[in-house]
Curated annotation (Swiss-Prot):
The keyword Ribosomal protein does not apply. The gene is mtrC. PROSITE patterns: MULTIHEME_CYTC. This is Multiheme cytochrome MtrC. The keyword Signal applies. Gene3D superfamilies: 1.10.720.180. The lineage of its organism: Bacteria, Pseudomonadati, Pseudomonadota, Gammaproteobacteria, Alteromonadales.
């Protein structure tokens, strides 16, 4: 007892000492809290909402969550005005029948608008901490049997309703998976695709549908489930159906979406758990129940017997792997030398996998097509796809090899393919430089190059780009610091065979590079494309806005996937317009270059002021538009950047 009493006295003395010490600290109330814990003044500005779930439980069938919201600087967000709360549970794999995949069951949602109505109990503790208790009781759902042993999920959509003081709030999503009684993490999950994979093409998943409401793929997967949406709108069916017919190289491989990621621990389900619904969403001509296109399967119980994980993965990724293996086997190196008679000599060497030149004759019978396109003036080509009104000349398109045979005018010299172009419209400045874009298409089977036959499968190989001058001086080259092809590969893959079919197909790699970025890494540019995508357009002479400056905007705008400049552009090189003339914007009509480029995305009338008053010519004649090409005054006021192309100088 004496020792216990002594201890109590000691504690009291220690507490008194601490109190006295704090009193002598100049009246400071201490720090606002450790990093990561809300405290102090609320966030004055909010670009990002970060959610942390502190407690999630279901009591007698009623879900409740406690959560913390901070901004990008870890400051507490106070006064959120409108949220939607949704509840779901996850049926495990096999629970509804042998071979069946796991499946979300969506109980419902409640929208809480502080200024109007709130079905449940919403508490804002005014320090970044919030809580919500649902009004709905999951046990009362007539369609779904609540099971407290299953993994549970609560999702939050925070609306972009401004805070009471007017602070703007971004639309945001968050979710938590938990066990009903303790709130602990469940022992199984269904996180098959990471939002990061979606954003590789979409940049922001929120822009795809539903007015920007849902930016997390897990929200999509939880809502688009049987019983909540109609047949065919289930997430695994809908997404495959939407993407399967897109001509994007990256979608040839399931792993473009189903990739290993901490946010998608179940990414391997695509090959591990085959079902009729999932497989049939891509293989849409198969009717498993009727036995059409496949042996009859009335349920999923027997799928895995044939379609084991390794074999399924090999079938679906093998094509891409084989293509990469073929592409790696050969390369090209080319030179272009201008001659006094205005011709140019093009010499193409075939390289082995190690970059060593080989005798082209040794692989000639395996070449389906070696195609070359030559033009003059890399920054503003003066040879049209068809004859240009300016130079009177069209690009020089020449196959050096076709179906294993040398073409007319082509010779083999010391194992290299040599061709002399017709006379080119050389001039001074940029037009002292000619350039040739080269594509190579090889016959192949699996991972092997094979002799070409009438019905040979083919693989497009690494493209090459060569420059040459008549003067002998260093060539001029088009800027490549605005769009790096790596951004194209995000959607189209690194084996994208550009224009294969009409052309040999061009696979863009470091082989076409002639510049490096700030880190010394080779830039894979897209400048070779202007050999065909000339200022005078392509085959339609402007009617399809085929000039390179416009074509990519037009085609990607039509598809609706590209909605932000930053999805493709790492920079804008506005100085490039100083060396451009007019661009063909309709059949036989031309527009000054800045305006032509802008109107490939924006309708002229939407720009908001008379373009002609700013020096522009819209759909004028060739001479008129080219004379005015450097008279546009757009950049006197406008200073567009990839992150804000509406920016103006103030």
């Amino acid at each position: 007892m004496m020792n216990a009493q002594t201890t109590k006295i000691a504690l009291l003395l220690a507490a008194s000492a601490v109190t006295m010490a704090l009193t002598g600290c100049g009246g400071s109330d201490g720090n606002d809290g450790n990093p990561g814990e809300p405290g102090g003044e609320p966030a004055p500005a909010i670009q990002i909402l970060n959610f942390t779930f502190d407690k999630s439980v279901i009591t007698n069938g009623v879900p409740s969550v406690e959560f913390t919201v901070t901004n990008e600087n870890d400051l507490p967000v106070v006064g959120l005005q409108k949220m939607r709360f949704a509840a779901a549970q996850l049926i495990p794999q096999g629970a509804t029948g042998a071979g069946n995949a796991s499946q979300w069951q969506y109980f419902g949602d409640e929208t809480c608008d502080v200024a109007a109505t709130c079905p449940g109990t919403f508490v804002d503790q005014k320090n970044g901490h919030y809580s919500y208790t649902f009004n709905m009781n999951l046990t009362a759902n007539a369609k779904i049997t609540y099971n407290d042993q299953l993994a549970q999920r609560v999702l939050i959509r925070a609306y972009n309703t401004p805070l009471p003081d007017g602070t703007q709030v971004p639309n945001s999503n968050a979710f938590v998976d938990f066990t009903a009684d303790t709130g602990a993490a469940p022992t199984y999950s269904r996180k098959i695709v990471a939002t990061e994979s979606c954003n590789t093409c979409h940049q922001d998943l929120a822009n795809v549908k539903h007015g920007g409401a849902y930016s997390d793929v897990n929200y999509c997967a939880t809502c688009h489930t049987a019983g909540k949406v109609g047949v065919g709108k289930e997430f695994n069916v809908l997404v495959h159906a939407k993407h399967k017919d897109l001509t994007l190289g990256s979608l040839e491989s399931c792993q473009s979406c189903h990739a290993a990621n901490d946010a998608a621990p179940d990414w391997g389900n695509w090959s591990r758990i085959p079902t009729a619904a999932t497989c049939g969403s891509c293989h849409s001509t198969v009717d498993f129940a009727a036995g059409k296109g496949h042996s009859q399967q009335l349920d999923n119980s027997n799928c895995i017997a044939c379609h084991n994980s390794d074999w399924t993965a090999e079938l679906h990724t093998g094509k891409t792997a084989d293509k990469k293996a073929v592409i790696a086997q050969l390369g090209m190196q080319a030179t272009l030398v201008g001659q006094t008679d205005d011709t140019a000599v093009l010499t193409v060497s075939i390289l082995d996998k190690d970059g060593n030149a080989i005798d082209a004759a040794t692989v000639q019978d395996k070449i389906k097509r070696l195609e070359t396109v030559t033009n003059v003036g890399p920054n503003f080509p003066i040879m049209g796809y068809n004859k240009s009104p300016g130079s009177g000349a069209a690009k020089i398109a020449k196959d050096l090899v076709k179906d294993g045979a040398l073409q007319a005018g082509v010779t083999l010299v010391d194992g290299k393919l040599v061709f002399t172009t017709p006379a080119l419209p050389f001039g001074t400045g940029d037009t002292d430089t000619a350039f040739t874009f080269i594509g190579l298409e090889m016959c192949s089977t699996g991972t092997s190059l094979t002799a070409c036959t009438v019905d040979s499968a083919t693989t497009s190989m690494k493209a090459e780009l060569a420059f040459g001058t008549k003067s002998g001086n260093a060539p001029s080259m088009r800027h490549v610091n605005s769009v790096n092809f790596s951004t194209c590969q995000g959607c189209h893959s690194d084996t994208f065979e550009i224009h294969k079919g009409h052309h040999s197909g061009f696979v863009m790699t470091e082989q076409v590079s002639h510049a490096k970025d700030a880190n010394g890494k080779a830039i894979v540019g897209v400048d070779g494309c202007v050999a065909c995508h000339t200022p005078d357009g392509t085959y339609a002479s402007g009617a399809n806005k085929g000039a390179f400056e416009m074509k990519l905007h037009v085609i990607h705008g039509e598809q609706g996937v590209i909605k932000e400049c930053t999805q493709c552009h790492n920079d804008f090189n506005l100085d490039a317009f100083k060396v451009k003339g007019a661009l063909a914007t309709s059949a036989g009509k031309y527009t000054t270059p800045i305006t032509a480029t802008c109107t490939s995305c924006h309708a002229p009338e939407s720009i908001g002021h008379g373009l002609e008053n700013m020096g522009a010519i819209v759909n004028g004649d060739y001479v008129q538009a080219n004379q005015a090409a450097q008279s546009e005054t757009c950049f006197y006021c406008h200073k567009p950047t990839p992150t804000d192309h509406t920016q103006v100088k103030m």
